Design a protein with these regions (language model features):
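Conserved structural motif at the start of ABC-family nucleotide-binding domains
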Residues: 15-17, 30
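The feature captures the beta-strand-to-loop junction immediately N-terminal to the Walker
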Residues: 46-48
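Helix-to-loop junction immediately C-terminal to a conserved catalytic motif
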Residues: 61
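Conserved ABC transporter NBD signature motif
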Residues: 69-81
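Conserved ABC ATPase "signature" region
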Residues: 107, 111, 118-136, 188
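Conserved ABC ATPase signature
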Residues: 140-144, 148
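A short, proline-enriched helix->beta-strand linker immediately N-terminal to the Walker B motif
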Residues: 159-163
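Catalytic Walker B motif of ABC-type/P-loop ATPase nucleotide-binding domains
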Residues: 165-168
Length: 263
């Protein structure tokens, strides 16, 4: 069962979108996005295809810049990518370096931080144990299952000691049991580290299970249309939490939102 962590107030946002719009090649992608994310908060983003979920994540990461408005981190405009913001993608096949071992992929993040070589091995062992990959150091990504490759991505992200985890549908390609196991691992890691999470997903149940809040976007152009607070107690459980009346109510509310958006 995931560890307990405090409910977070959003009085002083760690990340803020202020009237953010984005157009590319004359095509309007986002319009007037206003959104805040508090330190230690777990925010999930849902919406139909084409609503800009991944684009908002890339703006936080500093991989894109808005056409107008501002995205701020710790009160300052986001510029280039930062070491304390880690990104985890769904396509683990492209995210991992196939010519590096499991340990080598985790080491990459430490190398970029300038961690002395003598200090890396112990930290790598610690991180691999934390994500359930103890003893897998010398294997290569193509020797791992999809779930194990995603665990490796998590370990590599944690090697950056990130304050923020940006997760772009990381479990969408996995089977149901593996997906739920990784959901619980992420919740446990977040509880232990206090990291802030911005999590993009198409899975409404996943959004309710993981999040403190769920933000719903509408498409063409992408814009914020709904924000739902998730007041389910933590730690959450894959069986009992999902069977509560509040979980079912929130899932239905989000389902109706998506259904109406796609009508």
């Amino acid at each position: 069962m995931p560890a307990v962590r405090p409910v977070v107030a959003v009085a002083e946002p760690l990340i803020a979108f202020r009237d953010v719009s984005l157009s590319i090649g004359g095509h309007e992608i986002l319009r007037n996005i206003n959104m805040t994310i508090g330190k230690g908060e777990f925010v999930c983003v849902v919406g139909p295809s084409g609503c800009g979920k991944t684009t908002t994540l890339r703006l936080i990461a500093g991989l894109m810049k808005p056409s107008s408005g501002t995205v701020t981190y710790q009160g300052k405009p986001v510029g280039a990518p930062r070491q304390d913001i880690a990104i985890m993608f769904q396509d683990y096949g492209r995210a991992l370096l196939p010519w590096r071992t499991v340990a080598g992929n985790v080491s990459l993040a430490m190398e970029s931080l300038g961690t002395p070589k003598a200090e890396r091995a112990g930290r790598i062992d610690e991180l691999l144990a934390k994500v359930g990959l103890r003893g897998q150091n010398d294997r290569y990504p193509n020797q791992l299952s999809g779930g194990m490759q995603q665990r490796l991505q998590i370990a590599r992200c944690l090697a950056q000691n990130p304050a923020v985890l940006l997760m772009d549908e990381p479990f969408g390609a996995l089977d149901a049991m593996t997906r739920q196991a990784l959901q619980d691992e992420v919740l446990a890691i977040v509880a232990a580290t206090g990291a802030t999470v911005f999590f993009v997903t198409h899975d409404l149940e996943e959004a309710v299970y993981l999040g403190d809040r769920v933000v719903g976007l509408l498409p063409h152009p992408g814009r914020v249309a709904k924000t739902v607070s998730v007041n389910l107690p933590r730690p959450r459980d894959q069986l009992t939490s999902r069977e509560t009346p509040e979980f079912l109510r929130l899932r239905r509310e989000l389902f109706d939102f998506i259904k109406e958006a796609e009508a």
